[in-house]
């Protein structure tokens, strides 16, 4: 399926910095609850992400990530997920997070 450039412009993809991470104990599949600061316009958003193979709460805090910020909220195992943190999904289902190659400002648009 093709989308137009106008369709793509509707997707709010932003840079954010991980502030807090904890294990989502209620999730069926191993997941982390991640709080990300997307800057003054978007603010702090929360996500439940299946990213436990390569990432722990300790090694994620302070890292910058890329997220889709304008999806509707979704309840995942008792957690309100407000943003989709983006990652590359390997053949075995492991997720490698997408991130800026250098430190940048929170809230910047990804195009």
Regions found by a protein language model. Give the residues of each.
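Phosphate-backbone binding interfaces of nucleic-acid-interacting proteins
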Residues: 1-111
């Amino acid at each position: 399926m093709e989308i137009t450039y106008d369709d793509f412009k509707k997707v709010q993809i932003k840079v954010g910095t991980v502030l807090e991470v904890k294990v989502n104990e209620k999730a069926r599949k191993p997941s982390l609850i991640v709080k990300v600061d997307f800057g003054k316009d978007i603010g702090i958003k929360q996500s439940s992400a299946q990213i436990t193979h390569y990432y722990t709460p300790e090694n994620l805090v302070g890292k910058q990530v890329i997220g889709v910020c304008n999806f509707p909220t979704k309840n995942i195992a008792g957690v309100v997920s407000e943003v989709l943190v983006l990652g590359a999904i390997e053949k075995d289902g492991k997720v490698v997070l997408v991130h800026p190659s250098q430190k940048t400002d929170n809230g910047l648009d990804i195009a």
